[in-house]
Structure formats: C-alpha cells, structure tokens
UniProtKB/Swiss-Prot annotation:
Keyword Cell inner membrane: no
Function text: Guanylyltransferase that catalyzes the activation of (2S)-2-phospholactate (2-PL) as (2S)-lactyl-2-diphospho-5'-guanosine, via the condensation of 2-PL with GTP. It is involved in the biosynthesis of coenzyme F420, a hydride carrier cofactor.
Pathway connected to this protein: Cofactor biosynthesis; coenzyme F420 biosynthesis
Keyword Isomerase assigned: no
Keywords: GTP-binding, Nucleotide-binding, Nucleotidyltransferase, Transferase
HAMAP family: CofC
Name of the protein in its database record: 2-phospho-L-lactate guanylyltransferase
Organism, as annotated: Methanopyrus kandleri (strain AV19 / DSM 6324 / JCM 9639 / NBRC 100938)
Amino acid sequence: MRFVVPFADRGDRKTRLSSCMDEETRERFALAMLRHVVRVLSKFGEVEVVTPDSSLSVPGTKVRRSDASLDELPLPDGEFGLVMSDLPLLSEEDVERALEGLKDADVVLCPSRRGGTSGVFVRKGVRFRPTFGGVSFPRNLRRAEKQGVEVAVVKSLGFFADVDEPEDLLDAALLGRREVAKIARSVVEV
C-alpha cells in the first residue's frame, strides 16, 4: 500500500489554533502530528508526504514538493491511501480496519469531526479522486455513488479526532502520546 500525506506550507500550518498557540508552537505541534501519522502508516507501506515546503524533511519518508491544492494532489497509480497529517490519535488498529474495508469495497472513507474526511483508501484499478475541505465526507459519499463505486465507511477515534480548532486539543492532551500530548497539555488545562 502506498500512502499520501498532505502537509501545509510553513506559516500555514494549524492557523486556526493561533488563538492558543504562537506560530512556533503550532509548527512544532503540526510536525509532531505529522511524524506520528507517518510512523503509524509506515508499518503498512510506503509513505509520501506532499507539501509546498521545499525545506521539509521527514526521516525515512519520501517528501514530494507540490503546490497542488488538496483536491488536486498527485495521487499514486494502483492501491493507495490518502491520510491527513493532523490525526494525533491515529493507531495501527485504525489503519488495519480501513485496509480491511478494501476487501469488500472499492473505496474506504474515514470521517472526521465536523463532517470532514480524514482518510481515503482506494483499491487498485479504481479511479476515485476525493474532495476535501469543509463538510467533505457527504460530498465524497455522493461522488462515489455517482461513479458507481462501492464504499465502506470506517468510523474510528483515530480518524475522527483531527485537530483543527482549539477545542480539539483536549483529545490530544488526554489521549495523545509523546510530543503531541506534551504540546497539547502545555496549552490545555487537564
């Protein structure tokens, strides 16, 4: 399985957290979440981080520079997973469940809070380009239905608990690990 993980440019990472984190802290937090997601995914295949940031380096992972929007990301041929970088609670079990879903479906969609899509897994030979931003999960369901693509939905805490807003930090502070939890706890009273 090949995985694509989009990652925002320096200065554009987690800007909605600016009311509780300065830019340096947001940068460290975003990088800590990215490293966590890459660490989990790398147990299942090759991971490629796609970013406009030409200075980004993630040890053991290919980094591709691209200015493409989320909806225009370069996607691999064959079977792939597209997973967001802001999932501090993502676990191997979450990814296993998503991959298991591909046994009976062409596409697996993983919803995030507020109706977003935090993971998309596509079976080899299936042409499906997801859409992102805002309430993208129902849009992706409709798109798949329109294309006649068989969809499985995997609901799990790891995919659901993305971090976009200050109130999302509590999950990372209480349930996260390592640097992600440490940074979240420095901002949220627990």
